[in-house]
Amino acid sequence: MDLMVPEYAYMFGFLQADGHLKQGPGQKGQLRVEISARDAEILRAFQKLTPYYSSVTGRTRPTNFAETHTSAIWTLCSLEARTTLNELGLPYGRKSKTIAPPDVEFSRRGYLRGLIDADGSVGFTSKGFPFVSLTTASTAIASCLCDYGKDATGAERSLKRNTRDGIYNVLYMMEVAQCLVADLYYPGCLSLERKHSAAASLAAWVRHAGSKPKPPRIKWTNDMDRLLLTAPTIANAAAELGYSSSACQVRRWKLLHDVVPLPD
């Protein structure tokens, strides 16, 4: 399973997010992926990529969200296949916090697209703004997306777990989302059809006339903080640093009130 091949990298990312590797007695066990029946085609694509016998079946059952829900299930029992996946980084049992990008070389674009298809969202907010996001409990996975997002778009994201559930929600919006989605969902790539369609719709979005992009977040350094504290006025500091007076005023207030540490 060469993860430099985008299709295998995609499949592995998808399996890390939505797959379940179960170990039975002796050498028995199985890989199982259950998703909505509307996305069954991706499981058939996995079946074709895998040189071992596997099956795609369906079932209908009641859930907490609907009276009936029809799902598609891909099942793979080969010990050799399970061993390969496990060695690459798909653990047995619960895995949400322990999964991480593989240690071998891999296609980051394919891998992250698989993760986003399984555990992320692509579309528009209630106000009509384009976005792409990924929710994960894994620090390594969140860091991987942040690093790739910076390389692809120049936008930086800081890692912080939600206080309510301890989950990371890495979010990109507006032009940055357009740029990242255009990079990840290129023509002919392996992906969920509905996510690919959503990605294509983002490309058509145009910012309203008169609406300006939000300026990039300032990365304050010790030298910048020292200048803020020693400048005779905020206006002098703003002119020297090339930032707005309001941004400099807020940063200086935080320094003087111990909201952020003073420069060394």
Language-model segments: residues:
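Internal intein/HINT superfamily modules and their associated LAGLIDADG
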Residues: M1-D264
